Amino acid sequence: MAKAIPRSGSRRSGRIGSRKSTRRIPKGVIHVQASFNNTIVTVTDVRGRVVSWSSAGTCGFKGTRRGTPFAAQTAAGNAIRTVVDQGMQRAEVMIKGPGLGRDAALRAIRRSGILLTFVRDVTPMPHNGCRPPKKRRV
């Protein structure tokens, strides 16, 4: 029987205490995507790199409760809490979608203490593009 050869290094590589250092981000962009089923809040820096994100689903809301205004408010609060700790003071807000969580997410962002430079609605509107799906008959 062949002898087992001892390995020179352990399986884990040398990343014991080298966590990625948190950047100071004074200005950022907050993207709110509010659909009828869920609300997703993404915080990026000015170059578009994602710093933090949250959604109603990751906050623990399941099923139809994800589309509620309270779920959107909770998701916005979770996403912004981490960037306030990283030093964000000013932000632009881009809101997309027709969902119920639009206003609730914006209210939560205003309450967080971040100074909003502008709020823009970037909901995509077709210039008579694709044919929409047929109406539901319930």
From Swiss-Prot:
Report if keyword Plastid is assigned.
yes
Q: What is its main location?
A: plastid
Superkingdom of this entry's organism?
A: Eukaryota
Q: Which GO terms describe its molecular function?
A: rRNA binding; structural constituent of ribosome
Pfam families attached to this UniProt entry: Ribosomal_S11
For this UniProt record, give its keywords in alphabetical order, as a comma-separated list: Chloroplast, Plastid, Ribonucleoprotein, Ribosomal protein, RNA-binding, rRNA-binding
Would you tell me the Gene Ontology cellular component terms?
A: chloroplast; ribonucleoprotein complex; ribosome
**Compositionally biased, Basic residues: which spans?**
9-24
- Which HAMAP family does the UniProt record give? Ribosomal_uS11
The subunit structure is: Part of the 30S ribosomal subunit.
Q: Which PANTHER family match?
A: 40S RIBOSOMAL PROTEIN S14/30S RIBOSOMAL PROTEIN S11
Which protein is depicted? Small ribosomal subunit protein uS11c
Write down the species.
Answer: Panax ginseng (Korean ginseng)
